[in-house]
Amino acid sequence: MHVSLVGSEMCIRDRDINGVELSGAIKNIYSMLIGASEGLSNSKAPKEIQSKFFLNTAASLIHRSISEMVEFVSHYGGKSETVYGLSGLGDLYVSAIGGRNSLMGKYLGEGYLYKDAKETFMKNITIEGAQLAIEIGPKILQDLNPKHFPLMFGILQTICENKKLEINW
């Protein structure tokens, strides 16, 4: 990795093209799961308890998501350390705290099926994580071990098979 400052902007170069591309793509899938933690916390509990439940669940999902991303990137020829950089953890953070993927995840966490949530709340909005899930989901579900990627399998089945979200830790 090479870091240089250009004007007031920081430019980071990484030679791990596979790792950068894979991390930047699959973080969209995982950010839907992290967003689901907000939907899962919408209950009859007081707001203070809901927000703490949401944040603790989100933190747990981020931790497990990074572990799965490292294994996924390594499996497909990238370097595991790339996941901890801007294209992985950095991009996951940005997408998970307020992006379109996170918003779709919130609806999935509330119990909506993907197709219903898309049609009702996000009809003309691009959801990169869902589009990627539809494109790669069938191959991933066939080729990888669900014990190694329980979060990814859960969201892929939710999107590709239009099932209710189940998070199998």
Regions of interest found by a model, annotated:
Residues 1-12:
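Single conserved hydrophobic/aromatic residue that forms the stacking wall/gate
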Residues 2, 21-22:
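Short secondary-structure boundary/capping segments
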Residues 14-16, 21, 27, 32-42, ...:
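NAD(P)-dependent Rossmann-like dehydrogenase/reductase catalytic/cofactor-binding core
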